[in-house]
Amino acid sequence: MIYDWVFAVHEHVAFTAFDTETTGLKAEEDRIIEIGAVTFDRKGIIARFSTLIFPDRAIPPDVSKINHITDDMLVNKPRFCEIVSDFSRFIKGTVLVAHNANFDVEFLNAELSLCKKQPLSHKVVDTYAMAQAVFPGLGRHQYRLQNLALQFGLTVHAAHRAEDDARVCMELFTTMIAHHAKQNGHCVNHAQSPTIKKLIQEIQASSTDCSQELF
């Protein structure tokens, strides 16, 4: 399975489930307007992170209809470059978890580039792809975050808001970990292999370098 390494390390490292809300769908053109994240390990939640972000542009009306974030809500909010150091410290030493992760990672890297910072170097788990592997055979639309939440009895308080979507993503991830353990047994012994030990060390040392400028 594509994420066998996750099942091998999950009892030994921390994870950060995160989500972004944006002004549109193109990372090269649009901007992040909200980040929500929750760091957790096998014992439970460690910390939460949430902030609205001023994007230096108006939010298209069709986007506001989806995430219910308005221009007025972003007045006097920090720009991404003002929160990047805090967010980088928050995710340091963790595996990142996101639903349709390429979207969020592309936006974060685009914002990091605008701030003249290094791109993300963390291991990333895409719960969309993970769900397809753990629960094969569902209809294509059933792998959407809210549909998976409904199927597995996870509570959704505010769909398309970053903080709640991050929490739901975390709960979906832990549901899949538990399902895999029940079906296949825990993978604790695998963590003793040299390869997995090295991976654990790399994860725990992972960070986004916000002290070094790219150009």
From Swiss-Prot:
Q: Which InterPro entries match?
A: DnaQ (IPR006054), Exonuclease_RNaseT/DNA_pol3 (IPR013520), RNaseH-like_sf (IPR012337), RNaseH_sf (IPR036397)
Single GO MF descriptor: DNA-directed DNA polymerase activity
Its Gene Ontology cellular component terms are: cytosol
Q: Which GO terms describe its biological process?
A: DNA replication proofreading
Can you tell which superkingdom this protein's organism belongs to? Answer: Bacteria
* Cofactor(s) this protein requires: Mg(2+); Mn(2+)
- The residues listed in the UniProt record as binding a divalent metal cation 2, with positions renumbered to this chain, are 19
In terms of Gene3D superfamilies, this protein maps to: Ribonuclease H-like superfamily/Ribonuclease H
Assigned EC number? 2.7.7.7
Catalytic residue list? 160 (proton acceptor)
Per UniProt, a divalent metal cation 1 binds at: 19, 21, 165
Reactions performed catalytically? DNA(n) + a 2'-deoxyribonucleoside 5'-triphosphate = DNA(n+1) + diphosphate
Cofactor note (record): Binds 2 divalent metal cations. Magnesium or manganese.
Assembly and interaction partners: DNA polymerase III contains a core (composed of alpha, epsilon and theta chains) that associates with a tau subunit. This core dimerizes to form the POLIII' complex. PolIII' associates with the gamma complex (composed of gamma, delta, delta', psi and chi chains) and with the beta chain to form the complete DNA polymerase III complex.
General function of this protein? DNA polymerase III is a complex, multichain enzyme responsible for most of the replicative synthesis in bacteria. The epsilon subunit contain the editing function and is a proofreading 3'-5' exonuclease.
Question: What is the name listed in the Swiss-Prot or TrEMBL entry for this protein?
Answer: DNA polymerase III subunit epsilon
Q: Organism source for this protein?
A: Treponema pallidum (strain Nichols)
Source taxonomy: Bacteria, Pseudomonadati, Spirochaetota, Spirochaetia, Spirochaetales
